[in-house]
Regions:
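Elongated, acidic membrane-bridging lipid-handling scaffolds
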Residues: 1, 6-11, 84-164
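Long, acidic/polar, low-complexity amphipathic helices and coiled-coil-like
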Residues: 45, 49, 60-62, 96-106
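Outer-membrane beta-barrel translocator domains and adjoining extracellular loop/strand segments
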Residues: 77-80
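N-terminal beta-strand/beta-hairpin edge segment
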Residues: 3-60, 68-70, 137-143, 149-164
Length: 164
């Protein structure tokens, strides 16, 4: 599910912005059924977007994407579940090419499968990627996108070393 409060775009400036964005898995009766992550973002700004490629080819092609104040909560899978997740197929034409992808003032939390234990936190981080590409060749890789260069800065982090 994707929701947002405000969407602005300018064809003349080739820009698009979303405010107060929330991402979550489809509704489910149990946290273990579907939730792998939830996310909230204060603002997403896309500059130099090619609207023709976006509409016609379903390809996001832009000069830069700035993601401001994201909060991501990730839930580990239950270790008892030995069923391997099926790799999802991507339609040819679903592509993402961006010169600069910047994540500013982010926070990441890692939780146990049921969400009862807080296992890790990384706060106040910035990640800057250059030459980001996502396509049918990268979707099934461990890191499902390619990049030319990246830089990470962070303020603080904690990890639970022993879960027992």
């Amino acid at each position: 599910n994707l929701s947002y409060e405000d969407l602005n775009f300018s064809i003349f400036n080739s820009s698009l912005s979303l405010k107060n964005v929330e991402v979550s898995p489809k509704d489910s009766t149990s946290i273990n059924d579907s939730i792998k992550f939830t996310g909230k973002v204060n603002e997403i700004n896309i500059v130099g977007i090619n609207f023709i490629k976006l509409i016609v080819q379903k390809e996001v092609s832009a000069y830069s994407i700035n993601i401001n104040d994201p909060l991501v909560n990730y839930y580990l899978k239950d270790t008892k579940d030995s069923i391997k997740e099926k790799k999802r197929d991507i339609k040819v034409g679903d592509r993402f090419n961006v010169s600069n992808l910047n994540i500013n003032n982010g926070e990441f939390n890692l939780y146990s499968p049921a969400g009862k234990r807080h296992l890790a936190n990384v706060s106040n981080f910035d990640i800057n990627f250059k030459g980001v590409r996502f396509n049918e060749r990268t979707i099934n890789k461990k890191i499902p996108f390619g990049y030319a260069d990246f830089e990470i800065k962070l303020d603080s982090m904690f990890f639970v070393i022993n879960m027992n």
